[in-house]
Swiss-Prot record:
GO terms for biological process: protein transport by the Tat complex. The Tat system comprises two distinct complexes: a TatABC complex, containing multiple copies of TatA, TatB and TatC subunits, and a separate TatA complex, containing only TatA subunits. Substrates initially bind to the TatABC complex, which probably triggers association of the separate TatA complex to form the active translocon. It comes from Novosphingobium aromaticivorans (strain ATCC 700278 / DSM 12444 / CCUG 56034 / CIP 105152 / NBRC 16084 / F199). GO terms for molecular function: protein transmembrane transporter activity. Residues 75-142 are annotated as: Disordered. Its main location: membrane. Belongs to the TatB family. This is Sec-independent protein translocase protein TatB. Residues 76-94 have a biased composition (Low complexity). One of its GO terms (cellular component) is TAT protein transport complex. The keyword Transmembrane helix applies. It is a single-pass membrane protein. Residues 123-133 have a biased composition (Basic and acidic residues). Keywords: Cell inner membrane, Cell membrane, Membrane, Protein transport, Translocation, Transmembrane, Transmembrane helix, Transport.
Amino acid sequence: MFDIGASELLVLVIVAIVVIGPKDLPLALRTAGRWVAKMRRVSNHFRAGIETMIREAEMEEMERKWKEQNERIMRETAAQETAAAQGQTPAAAEDQNDPFPTPLAADAPHTDPVMTGPMPPEAKVEARVEEAPAARPGSQQP
């Protein structure tokens, strides 16, 4: 970062020993280390803020491009639908744009008719005949 070579660092150490003295040198180095750490934290925080702003600007640009592309696609699709609808009858074009189409009888599920009233007398007789087991000749029924 500061591009300090080995010889320059040696000169700084000798000057620090002479000026500060060997007794107070550890305290001075600790204080200098704290200041360097604070400067690094501030610069990292500043860098992170700048990078966040850049990312947000890029996201806004991408969202703007996506919105423009979406609008272009919607216009092209609408133009194709109107071109296709011109060859249809007005009723068919209206049915195409109906958001809730009327269901057709063919779309309904198939069910058998259900009788809701009392059974006719001939149906009762047939039901009894089907329920009764077939009697075998020579065997008794309980």
